[in-house]
Design a protein with these regions (language model features):
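Claisen-condensing/thiolase-fold acyl-transfer catalytic domains that form or cleave C-C bonds
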Residues: 1-5, 12, 72, 76-82, ...
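Short gly/pro-enriched beta-turn/loop segments at secondary-structure junctions
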Residues: 3, 41-43, 127-131
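Alpha-helix capping at helix-to-loop junctions
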Residues: 5-6, 14-17, 54
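Active-site-adjacent elements of ketosynthase-type condensing enzymes
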Residues: 15-29, 35, 144-145, 191
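Short acidic/glycine-rich loop or secondary-structure boundary segments that cap or lie
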Residues: 18-19, 56-57, 97-98, 142-147, ...
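Condensing-enzyme catalytic core mediating Claisen C-C bond formation in acyl metabolism
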Residues: 22-119, 124, 165-168, 207-213, ...
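A short alpha-helix capping/helix-coil boundary motif
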Residues: 97-98, 128, 174-176
Length: 245
């Protein structure tokens, strides 16, 4: 929006074994995992963020026109999505410290930060849950999801019918024993690129509030027994008519 860059790549990744070794226990140790534990996702996702037509200049518009023409010439215009996802708004999150110190229960540490961001988004843009097709958090897991929904109900906002968590969607709880669900930077990124954006492109979802969640800890702070604050930034994603239409 400010015009500092015409085109930016944003990507994130995570790896199960590296996260276990750094923040929990070596895999060969064979420790028992509590049910509140999430399973770090080995995955990644990358999106390209472009400026709008007002800021992108002639080169950007020409590139879009060439891409559309190439699809038509190749007989693949139907492969181009009907709607192009765009960032229509953002709500920066604030650090929320709930005095959590258990690295085996990250969902509880991050849930209230997600609540704070969602409520702030409602206040900033004068919106309510029904204004969104989905409100999607990052990696709260099953434990964090229940905490989130409880706090939202206490605030007078019931989002249970439209809430989705990337960590829960990543794995099948019936066939994959990942306890509370998935976690990690790659979890939100992979679900965003592989599931959420295609839904917007197909026109099934018109407006989505995407709230990736994070826990602020390091190997040193964890070993010292310090608190694990949480943070969550919110991005509103909407579908606009594609340039190829």
């Amino acid at each position: 929006g400010a015009g500092y860059a015409a085109r930016v790549l944003a990507l994130a990744s995570s790896h199960f074994a590296s996260a276990e070794r750094q923040f929990r226990f070596p895999l060969a140790y064979g420790n028992q995992r509590p049910q509140s534990t999430t399973w770090t996702v080995t995955g990644c996702g990358c999106v390209m963020i472009e400026g709008n037509e007002k800021n992108e200049g002639k080169d950007g518009r020409r590139a879009k026109e060439n891409a559309s023409e190439s699809l038509k010439n190749a007989g693949q215009e139907k492969l181009h999505p009907k709607f192009q996802p765009c960032i229509s708004a953002a709500t920066p999150g604030k650090i929320v410290d709930m005095q959590m110190r258990d690295s085996m229960n990250m969902g509880a540490a991050m849930a209230v930060a997600a609540v704070d961001t969602i409520l702030q988004n409602f206040r900033d843009f004068n919106r309510k849950p029904s204004d969104y097709d989905r409100i999607i958090t990052g990696d709260l897991g099953m434990v964090g999801k229940e905490i989130l929904l409880d706090f939202m109900r206490e605030a007078g906002q019931d989002i249970s019918s439209i809430h989705m968590d990337c960590g829960i969607e990543m794995f099948d709880p019936k066939t994959q024993d990942t306890h509370s669900g998935g976690s990690g930077c790659g979890c939100s990124a992979a679900v965003l690129c592989g599931y959420i954006l295609p839904k917007i492109q197909a026109g099934e979802w018109k407006r989505v509030l995407f709230v990736p969640t994070g826990a602020l800890l390091s190997q040193i702070s964890f070993n010292e027994g310090q608190n694990v604050p949480g943070i969550a930034h919110g991005v509103v994603l909407e579908g606009k008519e594609s340039f190829g239409e």
